[in-house]
């Protein structure tokens, strides 16, 4: 089922360190270009060969984490985020329409010009949601390096070694519980977009799954005061 999010234009964004109900935007990752692919393209260009991009430009990513306080001061409980991710996988990823834009478009729905990538798969590793996305490239960019789509721009920035992020868009409520901002169970994922910033600690897009390992949060984590408070809350929330 594809949802209608036309009502989003009427919602206010719940900003950093705020409570309330509305649009929740989390900048959750960085894109780092696939080294072998980028090196080969640059080598071909330097050698005077024809500019050719691979047919499938795919990168791995950390998309989001549960139980970890992000830069917006919010924590997504395990049951809330896992439930919504599973729904997103069934409704979007499995049907080949898990598309995202470059930057968050002002409109509530994507046009063809907005599409920058399509998420191919998502899976959990501990507290961390990882997966792969395929950049949406035009024939003109693949053959001649001419940018005409958002996906072309993303690929071109990766060629220039620019760090790019991934950001989730969703709708839901944030409540203050014991001094910690918790995303409530009315949360609903809309999509992930490609952006220029990130808010989830250590969430990055990498060459492959092995490169993601240093940024993946396991079920057990350091017993700092904030983590101890979070753990106590999780026993109530999960």
Language model region names:
Residues 62-64, 102-103, 125, 134-136:
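A structural detector for beta-sheet-dominated domains
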């Amino acid at each position: 089922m594809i949802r209608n999010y036309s009502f989003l234009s009427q919602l206010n964004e719940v900003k950093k360190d705020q409570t309330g109900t509305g649009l929740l935007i989390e900048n959750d990752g960085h894109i780092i270009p696939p080294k072998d692919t980028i090196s080969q393209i640059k080598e071909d260009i330097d050698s005077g060969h024809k500019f050719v991009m691979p047919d499938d430009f795919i990168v791995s990513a950390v998309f989001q984490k549960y139980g970890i306080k992000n830069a917006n001061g919010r924590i997504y409980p395990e049951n809330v985020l896992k439930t919504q991710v599973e729904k997103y996988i069934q409704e979007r990823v499995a049907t080949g329409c898990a598309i995202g834009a470059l930057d968050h478009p002002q409109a509530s729905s994507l046009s063809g010009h907005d599409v920058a990538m399509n998420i191919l798969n998502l899976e959990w590793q501990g507290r961390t949601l990882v997966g792969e996305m395929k950049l949406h490239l035009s024939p003109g960019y693949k053959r001649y390096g001419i940018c005409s789509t958002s996906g072309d721009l993303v690929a071109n920035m990766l060629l220039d070694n620019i760090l790019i992020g991934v950001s989730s868009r969703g709708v839901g409520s944030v409540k203050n519980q014991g001094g910690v901002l918790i995303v409530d169970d009315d949360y609903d994922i809309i999509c992930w977009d490609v952006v220029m910033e990130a808010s989830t600690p250590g969430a990055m897009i990498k060459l492959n799954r092995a490169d993601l390992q240093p940024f993946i949060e396991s079920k057990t984590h350091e017993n700092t005061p904030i983590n101890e408070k979070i753990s106590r809350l999780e026993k109530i929330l999960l």
